Amino acid sequence: MGKRKQIKDGDVSMGGTDPATGDSSDEDIDMVNVDFEWFDPQEIDFHGIKHLIRQLFDVDAQDLDLSGLTDMILAQPLLGSTVKTDGKDSDPYAFLTVLNLQEHADKPPIKSLTTYIKRKASGTPSLSPLAQLFSQTPIPPIGLILTERLINMPSEVVPPMYAMLQEEITWAIEEKEPYNFSHYLIVSKTYEEVESKLDAEDSRPQKKKKKAGQEKGERFFFHPEDEVLERHALCKGGYEYEHKHDEGHSDSKRAFQELGIRTAGSLILIEAGRFEGAVKEMAEYLSPQQ
């Protein structure tokens, strides 16, 4: 049985969604009502979760031990959730979990990940509070939240995952397990629109004048809930990936009018005392429109 059969009493419409706004267009989109089920992570989810972690860290995923991280997630099956549509043996379309960075500090997958995060935080002024926490010995009991979903998944599946995670953490603490966190760190990703390289090749001289003003574009969220989480953050910031995408990658993502996109990493640090309020506001923000 799933953890929870459906979101409240209704089905969720699954169709084309603009990651920039979370809005879906009525034009040329077939909407399908889907029943989503939530499950504890299980061994059969290994490849699905590993794929989603790779998607989360984008091009920098090659520097991390994805298999090791996935094994750690599956080793705590009573914490976190997967979302599926065809029973517990089907592939996960989304997942959410939390890992204790202090408890697992000496494990190789966490060592490489914390080194990566510390490097990014140290190079981003707005993330200096996070860099300071990571410089402490031992590192504080920070709960690292890893969550990702397929690109066309509705954001309404997210609040139940966070709500169940809060319940599971409470139960774990009652059982004296090491999940009494001081902070929560959410790893995410953003994007900005960029001029198409294909268009640039054909552009006329006067068109190039626009480029200077477009060097730093507006930042958009892949995960709409990040907009709410950032409002509750002790610190937040974006960073460039260490590895570069192949030439033409932005054009392969041309889902936004005539523009391509450039992706970037994002870190959101929330004090534990503010986490419940953040989750509550997120649920209100992402609640289905009546």
Curated annotation (Swiss-Prot):
A cellular-component GO term for this protein: cytoplasm
Protein name, UniProt field: Protein bcp1
Function description: Involved in nuclear export, actin cytoskeleton organization and vesicular transport.
Biological process per Gene Ontology, one example term: protein transport
Keywords noted in UniProt: Cytoplasm, Nucleus, Protein transport, Transport
Pfam family, one: BCCIP
Main localization (coarse): cytoplasm
Coiled coil keyword on record: no
Transport among keywords: yes
Primary gene name: bcp1
Subcellular location: Cytoplasm; Nucleus
Region (Disordered): 1-27, 197-217
Family according to the record: Belongs to the BCP1 family.
